[in-house]
Regions:
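N-terminal binding-site loop/beta-alpha segment at the start of enzyme catalytic domains
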Residues: 1-53, 78, 91, 130, ...
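Short, acidic/polar
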Residues: 1-5, 70-87, 124-129, 153-158
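Alpha-helix N-cap and loop-to-helix initiation/capping positions
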Residues: 25-29, 33, 68-76, 112-126, ...
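Short acidic capping loops at alpha-helix termini that bridge into adjacent secondary structure
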Residues: 44-47, 91-95, 141-142, 166-169
C-alpha cells in the first residue's frame, strides 16, 4: 500500500465479502488489512476509499443478524456500513457501492428467463433512502453500483431525480478486450448521457489476456491454479 501511494495509486476498492473466494473465515479480511494500514500509517486522508455491500445472496455469514438472504434492507445496510467502518478503522467511506443487485438480474454472465425476474425485486427508492441516511450522518460521501444493468442504473437515477434522493455516481462492471457487455448492453449510452462514471474491473480478463494460460498452460501461483472456479 505504501508502494501504491508512492506511485500515485490512491483509489482503493474493497468489499465487505472480500477476500475472494469468499468464506466465513476470511470474510472482511481485506477491509481489516486496509484498516490496520490506516492505523499504522496515519494516511487515511491520502486515499480515496471505496467498499461495497453484498447483494442478493445466501452468504448470510456476512451478517450478525439472523437472515435468510443478504439484502439491501435498512437493517442490513446499517449493519454493513457500521461493520465496514470498524474494520477499515475510519469514520467515513468515500464511495459506498452496491456490490450487485438486490433482485433477480442477469449478473456475472447468468442467463435469465422471463419468469426468473419475478422471484426477487428491489425497492430502488427505499435503498436510496437507506443510503441517504448514512450520507447525512457523514459515514459515506458518494454512492455507486456494481455488476449492474442498464435497467438498474436508470431505475436508481429515476428515483433520485423524482424524489431528491442521492444519485449514483459510478458503476463498477467488468470491461476488457473480450468482455464488452458494458458497450453492447446499453450501459455505455446510459452512463455517457447520465454522467455515471465507469470503474472497470477485470481489465486482463482474470489473467487470460496476459497470455500466461496459452496452449493450456497453468503456471504455479496463478489464479486459475490456486482457485480453479475463478479461472
Amino acid at each position: 500500500m505504501d508502494y501504491a501511494l508512492e506511485r500515485g495509486v490512491n483509489f482503493w476498492d474493497t468489499a465487505e465479502m472480500y477476500s475472494v473466494p469468499s468464506a466465513p473465515e476470511t470474510q472482511g479480511s481485506t477491509e481489516r488489512i486496509i484498516g490496520s494500514w490506516f492505523k499504522q500509517s496515519g494516511r487515511r486522508e491520502d486515499v480515496i476509499l471505496a467498499t461495497k455491500i453484498t447483494g442478493l445472496s445466501r452468504m448470510t455469514y456476512v451478517r450478525d443478524a439472523d437472515v435468510s438472504w443478504t439484502r439491501h434492507t435498512k437493517d442490513q445496510v446499517d449493519e454493513a456500513v457500521h461493520k465496514s467502518l470498524q474494520r477499515l478503522q475510519t469514520d467515513y467511506i468515500d464511495l459506498y457501492q452496491l456490490h450487485w443487485p438486490d433482485r433477480a438480474a442477469p449478473t456475472f454472465g447468468s442467463k435469465m428467463r422471463a419468469k426468473d425476474y419475478t422471484y426477487a425485486y428491489e425497492p430502488f427508492e427505499e435503498i436510496l433512502a437507506h443510503l441517504q441516511s448514512h450520507i447525512e450522518a457523514g459515514r459515506i460521501r458518494h454512492i455507486g453500483v456494481s455488476n449492474e444493468t442498464a435497467f438498474g442504473v436508470m431505475r436508481f437515477l429515476a428515483e433520485s431525480n423524482a424524489r431528491g434522493l442521492p444519485r449514483m455516481a459510478s458503476i463498477q462492471n467488468a470491461y476488457n478486450l473480450v468482455n464488452r457487455t458494458f458497450e453492447d448492453g446499453g450501459l455505455e449510452e446510459v452512463c455517457v448521457h447520465e454522467k455515471v462514471s465507469l470503474l472497470a474491473y477485470s481489465p486482463l480478463g482474470q489473467g487470460y489476456l496476459t497470455g500466461k494460460y496459452r496452449n493450456g498452460a497453468l503456471p504455479d501461483g496463478s489464479r486459475k491454479k490456486l482457485f480453479e472456479r475463478l479461472g
